[in-house]
């Protein structure tokens, strides 16, 4: 990560910690106060657009939590024997569609 990216991400974290809306102007102002001069304006606008409408504190508290994946696995196991039969039927349909799309288009590889 470059110095500009780190500076913008730290500025965004500071703004989020203070409960201030994250905008490109506020990031640029904070970088100016910290005397970080080598940040191009595109970085501040990219970070502001990427974090617009997102709760940074919520993102930080949920980093690495895999709680959402476990219920999906349990639900899939409870489906029983019907799921493999449906999966096999879906695979057969996909194979048939692939065969139709591989038709000869009038030119060969070595023509």
Curated annotation (Swiss-Prot):
Instruction: List the record's Gene Ontology CC terms alphabetically.
Output: cytosolic large ribosomal subunit
Keywords assigned: Phosphoprotein, Ribonucleoprotein, Ribosomal protein
Q: Which GO terms describe its molecular function?
A: protein kinase activator activity; ribonucleoprotein complex binding; structural constituent of ribosome
Q: Which Gene3D superfamilies match?
A: 1.10.10.1410
- State the Gene Ontology BP annotations: cytoplasmic translation; translational elongation
Quote the CDD domains the UniProt record gives: Ribosomal_P1 (cd05831)
Reproduce the UniProt comment on modification after translation: Phosphorylated.
Q: Which residues cross the membrane?
A: none
UniProt region (Disordered), positions on chain: 84-111
Q: Does the keyword Disulfide bond apply?
A: no
How does it associate, per the subunit comment? P1 and P2 exist as dimers at the large ribosomal subunit.
Its annotated function is as follows: Plays an important role in the elongation step of protein synthesis.
User: Would you identify the family this protein belongs to, as annotated?
Assistant: Belongs to the eukaryotic ribosomal protein P1/P2 family.
Task: Write the protein's name.
Answer: Large ribosomal subunit protein P1
